[in-house]
Each structure stands twice: as structure tokens, then as C-alpha cells.
Amino acid sequence: IQKEMTVMFADIRNFTTLVERMDPKHNVDFLNSYLSYMEPEILAAGGFVDSYLGDGIMALFDSAPASGGTTALACGATAALGMLRALRAFNANHSARAGLQLQIGVGLNRGLVTLGTIGGADRLKCGVIGDTVNVASRLEGLTKRYGVPVLLTGSTQRALTPELRSRTRFLDRVRVAGHVEPMYPLAGPHLPCRVHDSAGC
């Protein structure tokens, strides 16, 4: 089945290095506590967690227009900003005690995905595949390089409400899967757009 959705990848930056000082049980407890702050923001924005990838999250948002003609919730931008707010709360409540200050990167891409049952005979799960997924993953990886917490593709940026779209600026283009995608950082309150002047921010 093919469907238009927004795919989110979110990952803790340098997680392996950060938790080297912890024992395995504390690592798991710390990670589960962090995820308990992130997941509600995804659910509140109309998305759902497809999978946990170690310290990473893959989430999906139905991109069908919501009531009032907006797809902001479906695009996951609201979730991304909520996750950044939740991260500040997590850092204040937990990370300081552990001597850590977490940072995350979030990539969002809207487009067609293929949904199906994936796996071998002994382990099957519903999953999504396609270029849309690959581009979202690539954007998440580029957030560290460009020094921004959230990166969107042009198709995602165009689907935002005017208010959210006003928080974006064109940054660069990235070649993925044989085509070029524009990238836009998303800045929220207390989250200035921190990119090179040549990018127009």
C-alpha cells in the first residue's frame, strides 16, 4: 500500500560517548526515561512511533489535511518543537543529576511511503520503506553538521501553517536517492536558527 505520510527520525547526539560513564542498567533506565518524555509529544501531534532504534526514534504522521485546512500536526513539526521543549525539561530534571546535557537531531520528510509486512517467517512487522524514509533519515544525520536541531524538506516546509513556516529559512540542498532536496531548519521559541550567513538565516 502506498500512502502520503511524514516520516520523522530523531536521535540523541553522541549518545554512546555520553553514556560510557554509566553501567548498563543505568544506560537502559536513562534511555527509557528520555523516551518517556519524547513519545507523548509525538502522540499529541497525531503521530505514532514506528520503531525505537537504540536511542533513535522513527515516527510517522498521516499527512491528510486536518480540520481547518492545516497539515501542521500531520507534518510532525509541532511534535519536533514539543520534543525540544520536553528535552529541556528532561535535561533539567534528569541529565543534570547524571552530569549530562542531551542534544537531539530531528529530520522530517513528507511524501509517499510503501506500507507492508516486512520480515522473515519468524518475525514479521508492519513497516514503511521508500525514498521518503531514506531522506528523513539523511536529514537527521545532517542536523549535527549544520548545527540545527530540526531539518525539514521543502515538501514538509510547504505543508506547514504560515506561522510555523515563518520560522524556517532555506539552508541548503542535499542529494539523496538520485535527486536533490532543499533543506529548511525549523526554529522555535528560544531556538534561533543557527546556520551560516550564506544560508540566508
Regions found by a protein language model. Give the residues of each.
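A structural signal for short, well-ordered beta-strand segments
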Residues: 7, 57, 104-110, 185
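A conserved hydrophobic position in a structured secondary element of the catalytic/binding core
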Residues: 10, 110, 152
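Nucleotide phosphate-binding site architecture
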Residues: 16, 58-59, 114-115, 157-158
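Acidic/histidine metal-binding catalytic segments
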Residues: 53-54, 96-107, 149-154
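Catalytic strand-loop-helix junctions within cyclic-nucleotide turnover domains
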Residues: 60-71, 106-126, 143-146
